[in-house]
């Protein structure tokens, strides 16, 4: 929680950061919010992360390391770390299951739309106009420099034990009956 007098990163102006007491959005360390970028709704920038141009960072989004959101990037409930980069009209949005936010890490670049349980890492990329949507809890879409994969959770991989059936008694056949 942020208290009055706490020092944070660089904020170009009041237009970059929500200042309502009920909102704990904050710029930490040497992070920067500049241009027309806006950070609100409990979101945060850490380390040397940057939100610039018209980037909108909201709904608990967090940028760490040297992550950068620029141009008209829209982040809602997302996590960016390392040298992750969101630009253009990128949309990185948490799905209905808020416990599995989209995660961008490494040197990845997102210029398209990512929603839900999606991880973009390494040198992975989502191109302008491309949409990666996954609202399933037990499946993760992984985009990396080695390709795109679907990772299944362990829930689907466990089999129920097989039921043991008692041996059935043979029915006696009546004589004289035809089949």
Regions found by a protein language model. Give the residues of each.
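Extended, small-residue-rich solenoid/repeat segments and analogous flexible loops
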Residues: 1-42, 47-54, 59
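Polar/charged, compositionally biased leader and regulatory segments
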Residues: 3-13, 122, 139-141, 179
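Residue-level signal for functionally critical sites in structured catalytic/ligand-binding pockets
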Residues: 12, 69, 176
